[in-house]
Amino acid sequence: MKLITAILKPFKLDEVKDALQAEGITGMTVSEASGFGRQRGHTEVYRGAEYTVDLVPKVRLEVLVDDKDSDRVVDVIVKAASTGSIGDGKVWTTPVDQVVRVRTGERGPDAI
């Protein structure tokens, strides 16, 4: 099993979520995040004063999938999240040794 983690632009979340649901992905975890990569934040003007925003708002999306679905799900996320601009985000996978559905006690792929 794999945990797929994606850091995305917030306005792309609905598009990514819809694309994943169209591929049969039935569960995901979404949380707010902030950070920076190559774009290094940005400068804004508020009431005539210029200030630098070091941490850019992002969304962290996590999806747990069977190994055989990992590459396909990553491709779906990348395609739906891409704008072609700096700051589109990152997607990575992490091996998962065990998953347990708390309600039923199911383990492994049956618990996804």
What is the predicted function of each stretch?
Residues 1-112:
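Positively charged, small/polar-rich N-terminal and surface patches that mediate targeting and assembly
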